[in-house]
Amino acid sequence: MQCNFFGSLYVSKIKREDKKDHAALARSLAASTASPVIVPNYRLTAPDNELQHPAHAQDVLELLTSLLSWSGPRGGACQSLPCYDPNRMFLIGHSCGAHMLASILLDSSDPALVPPVELLRAVRGVVFAEGIYDIDALLMSFPTYRDWFIRDTFGDLPTYDRYSATKMTLREGTTHISWIIVHSGGDTLVDALQSQEMYHHLQSLHQGGPQGTGQVLKNWDDLKGDHSAILQSGKYIQIVRDFIHMVSSA
């Protein structure tokens, strides 16, 4: 089973992005991987709600936790659908979706984002694409993002170091999880430094572990499209499919 979390940069100032916007991608992923795909919504920060982190990630955690006891479509009967297995999850986070998943799967020191051990046990692999991980570094590259969405989402702070996924440690019970960090050379909204930092951080966390750094992969060469355009590319589907097949057959 795959759960896909697509980024809306946390905020909604013009158009509310919705899960239905990614229906075609979900169908392509399901067909390519022969597994169910779930694309959830989560609350967005808007001028009328003043919603701030970690509320968005809490929505994600609530959804993931509920999947552990969900019987699946049609009460769990596979029929013509791919079988739903809540004990075998692959999570896919794009843009801020990557930051939300990292804040849950890694130790963000936020009591509101502590996942149940059953969820951590169920996660087999994680795909991070065009992700945001280090907010201070992001603002160094894109200073206008502070006014666009960072201040509304995280507050007006002198530093956002405490929210940096590149500083978070492994949670107990996550050493079995495999990761792949994907970044397109054509992304104009999030620079490659974000993915480079996260890749090296995850490698350092897994150094000396049961599988070593071999369970932390990267793909920074195959995608050429812009930030969200890569989601419509066949190459992106192939990268996700190959990663899931590799982890599943290990």
Predicted regions located by residue number:
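Conserved alpha/beta-hydrolase
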Residues: 26-47
